[in-house]
Amino acid sequence: MNSLYIDRKNLSLQHQKDALLVFDGEHRCATIPLRLLERIIIASQVQISANTLGKLGSMGIGVMVLCGYQ
């Protein structure tokens, strides 16, 4: 997996050690090893902390945020 596309609303992204955790409310939807990712494309309303963005950047993982007009 090189690219992770996120298009579901109201998810939150967190990191724990070298994994990206995807939550829908309190429920963890996915755990993805960061070593598998080159980029993350976000195409919906997602919550992500500066700490997690920093971890992604330190591992060379790009983050692209797409904004569509409604």
Question: Where do the PLM segments sit?
Answer:
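N-terminal intrinsically disordered, cationic/polar leader segments
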Residues: 1-70
